UniProtKB/Swiss-Prot annotation:
It is an enzyme of class 4 (lyase). There is a cross-link at residue 42 (Glycyl lysine isopeptide (Lys-Gly) (interchain with G-Cter in SUMO2)). The modification N6-malonyllysine is found at residues 111, 312. Its main location: cytoplasm. This is Fructose-bisphosphate aldolase A. Belongs to the class I fructose-bisphosphate aldolase family. One of its GO terms (biological process) is glycolytic process. It comes from Pongo abelii (Sumatran orangutan). The modification Phosphoserine is found at residues 36, 39, 46, 132, 272. Catalyzes the reversible conversion of beta-D-fructose 1,6-bisphosphate (FBP) into two triose phosphate and plays a key role in glycolysis and gluconeogenesis. In addition, may also function as scaffolding protein. One of its GO terms (cellular component) is I band. The keyword Cytoplasm applies. The modification Phosphotyrosine is found at residue 5.
Length: 364
């Protein structure tokens, strides 16, 4: 029988559980603003804006200083390393800005995906080296939760057993290191929407991946009440010719989660996976209205699905600040309602809100 050496004190556990609950309090979700310098370059390029440190700071400030209507909608914000140490125009560090609006500060801690030798183009995620020291420093600098993204692809022979096992293990090591440092880990095993697979295949793979992840978290003695899961919704591949209804997507998603995610997990914060802003809100709303028993908070951790319209409205011009913030507030309010199952699409979504945000082989 394995013997359990106490990994966390009752005080540490309470702190982690409290942080997780604050992030996914009713009506709240996460703004993922942790695009790496390379990823934000693509976003800025799409609006003809240069990728300078000042433009990145100004754009992040635009989101973080939106008016108080977003306060009841955003429980946490995930930042990239650079952004954690930037300041608003009034001199306040961004973590202070987030906390003043009732949000919890998060930080992306992985160092990106790398090829997994001996597989057909599959990957694992690097960044465990020195992670404990980085977490200790981030905690001092105001961060209370972290994110680590692993990526799996559906193909004829993928994901392989090796890729599933390796990524589950690396997520568990990351989660363990975070919890030792008082940081709530968001566990993100993203199954990419690339491919022509149907809904059933995605559901099957999602179940296998999540089962492996929670087995690894158990093996590594992770305190589940002090974690959040960031999964993909179960959807058909982008190249799948068969169309599936919102209801089918919802049933497949909730069923997969019910079969694999322990009720002890505090919250599930979905990634948008290249869905349009409107689609991401509609699906999240439908998931929350699903009549099956769902013991966790089911909310959002959206990047592009909260930012696309705001980015377009800003267009890199300072005079468009208010218009851009208005677009961001709109999406935040929509998703706040959606995570409570109270969202009714107005049918007036702008062009940007209905535009697919799919990028093949998406890397942060």
């Amino acid at each position: 029988m394995p013997y359990q050496y106490p990994a966390l004190t009752p005080e540490q556990k309470k702190e982690l559980s409290d942080i997780a609950h604050r992030i996914v309090a009713p009506g709240k979700g996460i703004l993922a603003a942790d695009e790496s310098t390379g990823s934000i370059a693509k976003r800025l390029q799409s609006i003809g804006t240069e990728n300078t440190e000042e433009n990145r700071r100004f754009y992040r400030q635009l989101l973080l200083t939106a008016d108080d209507r977003v306060n009841p909608c955003i429980g946490g914000v995930i930042l990239f390393h650079e952004t954690l140490y930037q300041k608003a125009d009034d001199g306040r560090p961004f973590p202070q800005v987030i906390k003043s609006k009732g949000g919890v500060v998060g930080i992306k801690v992985d160092k990106g995906v790398v090829p997994l030798a001996g597989t057909n183009g599959e990957t694992t995620t690097q960044g465990l080296d020195g992670l404990s020291e980085r977490c200790a420093q981030y905690k001092k600098d105001g961060a209370d939760f972290a994110k680590w993204r692993c990526v799996l692809k559906i193909g004829e022979h993928t994901p392989s057993a090796l890729a599933i096992m390796e990524n589950a293990n690396v997520l568990a090591r990351y989660a363990s290191i975070c919890q030792q440092n008082g940081i709530v880990p968001i566990v993100e095993p993203e199954i990419l929407p690339d491919g022509d697979h149907d809904l059933k295949r995605c559901q099957y793979v999602t179940e296998k991946v999540l089962a492996a992840v929670y087995k690894a978290l158990s093996d590594h003695h992770i305190y589940l009440e002090g974690t959040l899961l960031k999964p993909n919704m179960v959807t058909p591949g982008h190249a799948c010719t068969q169309k599936f209804s919102h209801e089918e997507i919802v049933m497949a998603t909730v069923t997969a989660l019910r079969r694999t995610v322990p009720p002890a997990v505090t919250g599930i914060t979905f990634l948008s996976g290249g869905q349009s802003e409107e689609e991401a809100s509609i699906n999240l709303n439908a998931i929350n209205k699903c009549p099956l028993l769902k013991p966790w908070a089911l909310t959002f951790s959206y990047g592009r699905a909260l930012q696309a319209s705001a980015l377009k409205a800003w267009g890199g011009k300072k005079e468009n600040l208010k218009a851009a913030q208005e677009e961001y507030v709109k999406r935040a309010l929509a998703n706040s309602l959606a995570c409570q199952g109270k969202y009714t699409p107005s049918g007036q979504a702008g062009a940007a809100a209905s535009e697919s945000l799919f990028v093949s082989n998406h890397a942060y």
